[in-house]
Amino acid sequence: MSGLEIRQLQVAYEGARGAAPHVALADVDLRIEPGEFVVALGASGCGKTTLLNCIAGFIQPTEGEVRLNGEPVLGPGADRGVVFQKYALMPWLDVLDNVALGLRFQRVPKAERERIALEMLKLVGLEKHARSQVYALSGGMQQRVGIARALASDPQVLLMDEPMGALDAMTRESMQELVLDVWGRTRKTVFFITHSVEEALFLATRLVVMTPGPGRIADSYDLPFAQRFLQTRDARAVKSSADFIEWRERLVRRLHERNQEEVVS
């Protein structure tokens, strides 16, 4: 069976000093088809990053399972590339060598890994900076290096953990467009987490809303805006359209309602 499948996932952490365990995720079921761009939206503490870490294989669930193409995810693997909010680049390596680092660990010959790394840099528009030092790049450019590095191993799934959270507003918007452009050309399966309603609406082909206490998937919506941008290449027109604004207000109201329900309960 192809695709990513999450079944009855629960993650609980031991309580401090004998306290009851903290349940971060409970009863999470999610299926992601190949080529989908799925965005998980929710406030801090709703378990978004915990869910991504389970998919990445960084942590094992207390109950339930994650399967990729029918096989259980038991640890990290080259079939899943991760882009972090903090760029996690190696400052002693130049841009090209940072992108090629995972391939080096896989013992890919130097000429081949540099060819692949340069190809990925072209994909994100940084081929002219291949031999630049990463600390000399802007935040947005460093995040592009992170995306290129995650793609270099040709993963089936790209996992993006609030990768634009540390960027200024203008850079964030240009990065959103870049991410959609890369997705449109590669059609990788993407799981992206954010707490920004507008970002979620713009990027997602399918949006899942998560709520805390413990983290669960409350709602799921199919959305047209990512495909609309790829057709028109006009992000401002997409984000200022009547249906985008209507969706944004609907989601903000829904999130407030969910948060109020959690406070009352």
From Swiss-Prot:
As its record notes, the protein acts as a catalyst of: taurine(out) + ATP + H2O = taurine(in) + ADP + phosphate + H(+)
Q: Which domain of life does this protein belong to?
A: Bacteria
Q: List residues of the ABC transporter domain.
A: 6-237
- Per the record, the major location class is membrane
Compartments annotated for it: namely: Cell inner membrane
- Residues reported to bind ATP: G42, A43, S44, G45, C46, G47, K48, T49
Disulfide bond residue pairs: none
Subunit relationships: The complex is composed of two ATP-binding proteins (TauB), two transmembrane proteins (TauC) and a solute-binding protein (TauA).
* Name of the protein: Taurine import ATP-binding protein TauB 1
Please spell out the taxonomic lineage of the organism that makes this protein. Bacteria, Pseudomonadati, Pseudomonadota, Betaproteobacteria, Burkholderiales
